[in-house]
């Protein structure tokens, strides 16, 4: 059948227009706001699909849609299944307490994943001594895990749109739990490397899906605080990992760095598998349509994803290749991704730099060195607490632009937070002499913690607002290049500090961070012009088509 035009859809005659309301909008124009594209099956349907089905509630639970049959040539009315008004099965209508519980479970899961990525940095020497390997081989164990972070989303993001979020959470976390065990009992470095790669791929799923899960649960005007809670988790985890790992390494040995991962990952798997229901609206409505077809003996009950007749190969091409198209053809995606890669790489460099400064320079133990990550974590928490205020400021800007602010307004937090990174690095660099007080480098970490969350959130929001219907692919591109670079930095950080010295190595990073400060300013002033010539950026013409 032909792809229906969005202006062909109309409501059931028994359902007056005023009986329809959007579940994630405060208006009656039936068009999704940018954040909603994380909650819509954009890559699962063709460009002519009508997305109202997923963002409206109707009195009868259906929207009548006329579609011309490719077989008979006649126009037939199909019943597009929707949620009913105040539908208890709509995740956005769940009680606020339960939505917060689900939010904290997925945020805790992200914390565990981030914790697992960094906890082993507390004792790189353990496997070296036991297996008789070089230091670079031991660092590869960290690297392959982060590489997995970049590879996994290419598979798990499309999988979640096809089968739902809950099965992907359950399957991948179970896989991650299983492959932590061989790490803890490994007899050689090969086992560690292979199993850590598998764990990295498996653990990437929660990081990939949580943004969509929160979009499933919360209306756009409610997402500010939940998103702040989530955004802090992936950065607090890496800060807490070396702290806990240091004490375990000093008192229990390096294998306990994996046993603690097993314990936390198992708890996260149990909580998210058995207490958090499916939240993805297209899957929920698809199951409802299947039940209605059977109960009513009427094949006309359907959903947009079921109407899409494109072969799976074409969908996979979009899933797998579109992120790279955006990365190499879109300057906005490329430079924002490079900037976030610098920030992410810096975070993993710190896992190596802190032991160099505190253990090598000051002669501290691993456990005491881990304490120096606390200011970094405090900076992250402080920044996350600022997120609601940043969101309120953006809402005021949005009102000033009649509800349609340019995407570049998302860069305002980045334009001042970007200076925190080089400032923190300069402080870290020139207070890292062995005879100076330990507080200096720690305060540098605090400044970096403050900047990193605001940069991360601002970058994500800018990409989502700029590409909207391509948002998932843009974020996947950013995640891929960010993870690959973060993995590489671990391998050369020690050599860089050895050859340049502690102060000048950190200063080099500070100058790189300083150069990156130009990126948000360039896009703030020139981004609109760049978007005008973009093949993929969202345009007003597309918005009018959606709202028609």
From Swiss-Prot:
Entry superkingdom: Eukaryota
Motif interval(s): Peroxisomal targeting signal: 258-269
Entry membrane topology: Multi-pass membrane protein
Subcellular location: Peroxisome membrane
Loss of function: phenotype: Leads to a clear reduction in benzylpenicillin production.
A single GO cellular-component term on record: peroxisomal membrane
Composition-biased stretches (Basic and acidic residues): 1-10
CDD domains tied to this protein: MFS_Tpo1_MDR_like
Annotated segments matching region Disordered: 1-32
Keywords: Glycoprotein, Membrane, Peroxisome, Transmembrane, Transmembrane helix, Transport
Transmembrane segments: 100-120, 139-159, 174-194, 197-217, 224-244, 256-276, 332-352, 370-390, 411-431, 436-456, 471-493, 505-525
GO molecular function: transmembrane transporter activity
Signal peptide limits: none
Residues bearing carbohydrate: 70, 93
Polar residues bias (residue ranges): 21-30
Family per record: Belongs to the major facilitator superfamily. DHA1 family. Polyamines/proton antiporter (TC 2.A.1.2.16) subfamily.
Domain comment quoted from the record: The peroxisomal targeting signal allows recruitment to the peroxisomal membrane by pex19.
Function as written in the Swiss-Prot or TrEMBL entry: MFS-type transporter involved in penicillin production, most likely through the translocation of side-chain precursors (phenylacetic acid and phenoxyacetic acid) from the cytosol to the peroxisomal lumen across the peroxisomal membrane.
Protein name as catalogued: MFS-rype transporter paaT
Species, as recorded: Penicillium rubens (strain ATCC 28089 / DSM 1075 / NRRL 1951 / Wisconsin 54-1255)
Lineage, opening ranks: Eukaryota, Fungi, Dikarya, Ascomycota, Pezizomycotina
Gene: paaT
